[in-house]
Amino acid sequence: MVKQTDQGQGASPTKQPLKKLAEVRDLNFYYGGNKALKNINLPVYEKQVTALIGPSGCGKTTLLRCFNRMHDLYPGNRYEGEIWLGDENPRNLLQMDPIEVRMQIGMVFQKPNPFPKSIYENVAYGLRIRGITNRAVLDEVVERSLRNAALWDEVKDRLKDPGTSLSGGQQQRLCIARALATNPELILFDEPTSALDPIATVSIENLITELKDQVTILIVTHSMQQAIRISQFTAFMYLGELVEYNDTMSIFTKPVQQKTADYVNGRFG
């Protein structure tokens, strides 16, 4: 049985009534004939950080990539169920054009992956493929996105330099700025600090904490301490199933399911 709550207080208690931005309903996912996700039901609350935790191979990254239809890139993969996005105008992401889905949902990967372009063009890229060419508009969005990613002051005098010339932590913040530039409703983070040093990790965690006031965040993390530090809600997954979902503090201090208690207390994983 999955423990769920419709309201929660989380690691950083919210003062406002919570609204669902997204919701997974009865989701199954297959890699060919292999059933990787089993009857997943999960709410994602607006302007909150929701963490997906669990041991390697539990399905958390598989679930994350269902949101922006990344699995469509490989033949033989198959979805069953629904993933809804939007409060006032809900859309089933599994019935939309994948390109349109990715315009509404940003993603930041484990390893920084700046495009082989300048810092400026990395951020402007998403706008250009939408047909926006006005230089003043591009300049405004690039600066705003870099500021929101806490990178502007470090790169404002070198916007023509390659994105790959930045340090690892700076490259990851550049990727976050690139995701922010298209004004997404949801940003997916797939272990965004796993390839970074401790100082860069703190910087990214602080940035995520600040960004939740602007955008909803769903993050996969192997670090339970990271989930405690930055998330308001946590979902524990095991063998393709959602075992327990609740506000983060409840998951870590008073889990309902024994499997959850064993995992968060380090008995396996």
Swiss-Prot record:
Catalytic activity, EC: 7.3.2.1
Organism domain of life: Bacteria
Localization per Swiss-Prot or TrEMBL: Cell inner membrane
Identify one Gene Ontology CC term for this UniProt entry.
Answer: plasma membrane
Question: Which keywords does UniProt give here?
Answer: ATP-binding, Cell inner membrane, Cell membrane, Membrane, Nucleotide-binding, Phosphate transport, Translocase, Transport
Q: Catalyses which reaction?
A: phosphate(out) + ATP + H2O = ADP + 2 phosphate(in) + H(+)
Give the membrane topology, semicolon-separated if more than one.
Peripheral membrane protein
Functional description taken from the UniProt entry: Part of the ABC transporter complex PstSACB involved in phosphate import. Responsible for energy coupling to the transport system.
Family, per the entry? Belongs to the ABC transporter superfamily. Phosphate importer (TC 3.A.1.7) family.
Quaternary context: The complex is composed of two ATP-binding proteins (PstB), two transmembrane proteins (PstC and PstA) and a solute-binding protein (PstS).
What is the protein's given name?
Answer: Phosphate import ATP-binding protein PstB
What gene is this protein a product of? Answer: pstB
